[in-house]
Amino acid sequence: MLRAQKLHSLKSSDITAILPTEQSQKLVLAKKNGDVEVYSRDGNTLKLFQVYPDLLQNAKNDPLPPVIENFYFANELSTIFAQCKETLILLSTTNLHEYDRIIDRRGINHCWLFERSHKNKEEKNTYLIYSTINTAKMRVLIWEGRTYKNMMEASLSYRKETIRSIYPGETGITLATDLGIYHWPYNKPSLIRIEKTVKNKFPKDMISALTELKEQAEKVIEKKPKKNSHFDAQSFSSMDRMSRKSSMSSLWYRTIRNERGNKIRYTFELDGNDATPMIIDGATKKIFKVELMHNNEEPFLIATDHATFSESNSEFDHMQYLSSNLLMLYNSSTIKFVDYENGFTFLQQKIPEGIKWVKNLSGTYFLVWTSNDEVQLFSYHVDDGSEDDDQESICGDINDPDFYQLWRKVLFYKFFIDSPHSKELCVSDNPEESLDICAMKLRDLTVMWCLRIFDKFQNYMVQLERSRNSRMIRSKCEEMIIKSIFDLFIKFWAPPQLVILKVFPSAISSLVLEITGQEHHCLLKEAEEVKETYDIPPHLLNRWCLPYLTDTRRHLQNLLSKENDDESRITWCYRDREIKQSFDFFLISNHDDVDLNTMLTLIDTVLFKCYLYYNPPMVGPFIRVENHCDSHVIVTELKIRHMFKDLIDFYYKRGNHEEALKFLTDLVDELENDNTDQKQRQKIDHGVKILVIYYLKKLSNPQLDVIFTYTDWLLNRHNDSIKEILSSIFFYDSQACSSRDHLKVYGYIKKFDKLLAIQYLEFAISTFRLEGNKLHTVLIKLYLENLDIPSTRIKLKSLLETTSVYEPRTILKLLNDAIESGSDQLPTNQLNFVKYLKIFPLSKLENHKEAVHILLDEIDDYKAATSYCNDVYQSDSTKGEELLLYLYSKLVSIYDSNRNSKLILNFLQDHGSKLNSAEIYKNLPQDISLYDIGRVVSQLLKKHTSKMDETRLEKALLQVELVATTYKLNERMSSYGVLSDSHKCPICKKVISNFGTDSISWFTREGRNIITHYNCGKVLQERFNAKNEKSSRIKQKTLGEVINELNNK
C-alpha cells in the first residue's frame, strides 16, 4: 500500500499560523509575538530564509498589532491573506508587504479561500469566504483573474449555526453546517436551504447491488429452518480468522471515539469535468450528492448509505480530498489515507508528538504541525512490501476478510495508476515499466475480484430462487452485477478460459475441456460442492456476456493477423498507459498452455453455442462469416436440430463442398422411412432440391465439375423441371457465377435446351459485363442462324450497336459470309438487314466511307447515310466534314445519272452550314436549277450571318464583364486604412508598430475596418467562421412559434 516517510522537521515555539506557498516553495510561520518566519524549501529540507519582526506593526504602525490566526494563499492574485480577529490583511507573496486590508468590526470567525476554473473561461476565479463572530452572516469576495469583481453577503437560518465545510462549485457555493446544507448561487445574495433528500430506488453500482441481494438472502435464511448447508458453512467459515487488532477492546475503543466523526460534514468534488458537490455526513452516516437543477428548480440531495465508512473512521474529525477518490483523514494523533466510498485504508501514520494541523502539498508530500509546535515534512510512496492482511484497514464484513482485502487491493492499484502523481508515488529506477507492471497486476486482481463477486452473487441468487419478494429490485441487481462484471472483463481483457469456466452455464463451460483438453480441477473444485447452480438468464447473457466474447475474439484475431510479424503483439490500453501484450496475456497462469488457434476455436465454439441456445436468429449470420468453430460440435448440434440450411452454410464457408452436397443428397434417404407417406416424401424431396440448388448456385469456377455432377443428380431425379433447375443454378447474378467458364456452362446447358443456352449467353453478356469477345462471337453466330425471328434481329442489331467488346474484323467476316451464303436463300429484307449490320463493325474500324457506300449504294437509305455522317461529325468535326463531302460527291454522282436534284438540295439545306462553301460550289452540278439552288444558298447565308452575330454578341458581353471586373479590382486595390501610432490589435491588445516588418491582417466586417497582427488575424478569422457556422445552424422560427411568443408576452 502507501508508506509515509518523514523527510525533515523544524521546531519554532508559539506558532499561531502556518502557510506553505507552492508557487515559491516557501513556508510562512506566524508567531504570537508578531514575528513572521519564512523558510525556503530546498529539496526535502526546510531552511530559514528570512524573519520579519513585528510584521504587522511595521506595516501600519498600530499601537496593538493584530495577532495572525491563520494564513490563506491565492496563487492567481499572488497574495497571502492573513486572518486576524477583525481584519484580513493582504500581503504580497514576494516581500510580505501589506498592500490592502479587509476590515469587518463584527469579527471574523472562520475563513475559506478557493481557486477554481470555470467552463469556457481561461482565467481562474478566486473566492474568499468568511463567517462573522456571533452572527449568522456569510460574506464572499470574488476575483476573476486578478480583477476584483463582486462581493455578496447572506445569512444562515440560525444565529448559532456552525459551518462545517464549504466548496465553490460551477454554479454556486455549497455550504454544510451542523443544522443543514445550503446552496449559494453566485448571482444571488441569499442562501437556498436544501430541504429535499431522495434515495436511489435501485442500487447504483455492483457492490451495492450485491449487498442488497445479500440482505434479501439473509431474510430468506432467517425464515427457513436451520440446515447445515454449504452456504451457511461459507458464511461462517472465516470466523476464526479474526485478528488481534479486531478484539473486543479495539471495538470498544472505537465506540468511545465515535462522537468525533458525528460532527463531520465535509464537502468536496471528485475529479472530472462533470463533477458535482459531494457531502460526507458523519451524523447520518450517509454520503450526499448535490443535484443542482438548471431550470429554476430547487436543488436536492441524493443520499447513499455510508455507514461502513463512518463506523470505520469515526475517530477522525478532519478531512481533505486529495485526488483519485482519496481522502486524507486526521485527528490529534493519526493520519489516514482512505478511499472516499468504502473507507479502505491505504496509509496510516502515527504522529507521537500529537497533531494540530495537516496540509496536503503538491505531488506526494504533506506537512504536519504537531502539538509541540514542530513542523514535519512527509512524503509518501507505494510500498508493495507492506502488510496487506491488516484487518484494521478493512471496512466490511469481518467474516470474509479475504474478499475485502482483494477489493482493497483493486481500489488501491486503481488509485495508484489513476493518480496524477503516479510516477512520483513509484519508487523505481524505471517508473514507466513499474507502472505497466502495476496496471497488469490491477488487471489480475480485478478479474479475481469479479469472479469472487460472481461466486457470492451466484450463491445469493440460488438462495433467492423461490422467493417472490422484491423481484423487481432483485432483477435490477442481477443485471447491474452481470453488466458491471462483464464491462470489467472487457476492459481488462480477462482470460477467456477462466471466464467461461467460472461464469458461463455448465452446458457451455464444458467446451473448455472438450476443445482444449484441460480439466482445470482447481477452478471447478468449489463449484462441484454446490449441487444447486445459477445460470445467467438468456436476455442478460445476450446483452452483456456475448460482447465480452466478441471483443476477446477481435483481440485474438488481431494477434493471429500479426502471427508472422517479428513482434506478434497488440496494445492493451488502460487510462494513459499503452502496454504491448502477447497471446500469453490471455492464458491462465500455472496451467498447460494452449495455442492461439485452439483458443480461437474455443471462443468461436462458445459463441456458437450461446447463439444456438439463447439467440437462434444469430446462428446463421455467425456461421456465414469466417470463424474457427469446432467442426464436430457444429455439425452435431445442427444435425440434431435439423438446421440443414445453416449446416450447408457452414460446409460452404469451410470449403467442404462435396461433403455438403453428399450430405444433402443422402438426406432424402435418411429422412424417408417406411412409414413416410407419398405426400411427405414429395415435401422432403422438394426441400432437398431447394437446398442443393441453393448450394450449387454459390459455387464458383474451381468447383464447376462438382456443379455439373450434382446438377445431373437433380435433373435425373426431377426430369419434369429441367428448365427451372438449370435457370436457378446458372442464371444467378453473383460474384461466384461471374467467374465461371461461361462457354463450358453454355455447352452443358445446350445438351438439355438449346434455346435456354442462348438465353444463358445473353444473360452472361448483359449481367456480368464480360470483356472477352468469344461469347459475343458465339452469340452473334447463333443470331445469324435465326434471322427469320424478328426478336432475334432486334437483339442482334442492339448487340452490335451498343457493345464494344466484340472483335469487329471477325464479326465483319461473319456478316460477309452470311451475305454470300444467303444471297440466293435470304429474303431481300433480311439480306439488306445483314448488309446494314456491317456499318457497326466498319464504324469501329473507322472505315466510314465504306459504311456510307453500303447505306447509300447498296441499301439505298439516304436518311441512314446522313444520320451516320452526322453522328461522325458530332464526335469529330474534321472527320465528319470529310465524310459529309464524300456523301455530297456521291449525291452529285447520283444526280448526274438521274438528274434529280432533290437529294442535293435536301443535303445542302440540312448540312450545308457544316461544310466549306467553296467546296460546295466547286462540285455543284452546272445544270442544276438556279431557282432551286438560290433558296438553299439564301438559307445558308442566313445561318452564317446568324452565327456571326452570335459570335459578335458573345465578344461584346465578355468585354463588358472584363470592364466590370477590372473596375472592382481597381476599387479593391485602391482601398486603404489609417494606422495610427496608438492603434492596438483587438485580439492581443498590443500596439501595432508602424516601423515594424511584421505582416498584418486587414478585415472588413459589417462596414468596419479591423486591423490585427497576422497570427491574431487567424484567431479572429476562426471566430468569424465559428459565428457564421453557429448562425447558419440556428433554427428558423415558425409562424406558430412567433404567435405563441407574442401570446406569452
From Swiss-Prot:
Q: Which domain of life is it from?
A: Eukaryota
Localization, per the record, is: Vacuole membrane
Q: Which UniProt keywords apply?
A: Membrane, Protein transport, Transport, Vacuole
The UniProt record lists the keyword Membrane: yes
Q: Its biological function?
A: Required for vacuolar assembly. Acts as a component of the HOPS complex that acts during the docking stage of vacuole fusion. HOPS is an effector for the vacuolar Rab GTPase YPT7 and is required for vacuolar SNARE complex assembly. It remains bound to SNARE complexes after vacuole fusion.
For this protein, the record's PANTHER family field holds:
CNH DOMAIN CONTAINING (PTHR12894), VAM6_VPS39-LIKE PROTEIN (PTHR12894:SF49)
Q: Print the miscellaneous field.
A: Present with 319 molecules/cell in log phase SD medium.
The family this protein is said to belong to = Belongs to the VAM6/VPS39 family.
Subunit details: Component of the HOPS complex which is composed of PEP5, VPS16, PEP3, VPS33, VPS39 and VPS41. HOPS associates with phosphoinositides and the PX domain of VAM7. Interacts with VPS41 and VAM7.
- Record's protein name: Vacuolar morphogenesis protein 6
Protein's organism:
Saccharomyces cerevisiae (strain ATCC 204508 / S288c)
Ranked from the top, the taxonomy reads: Eukaryota, Fungi, Dikarya, Ascomycota, Saccharomycotina
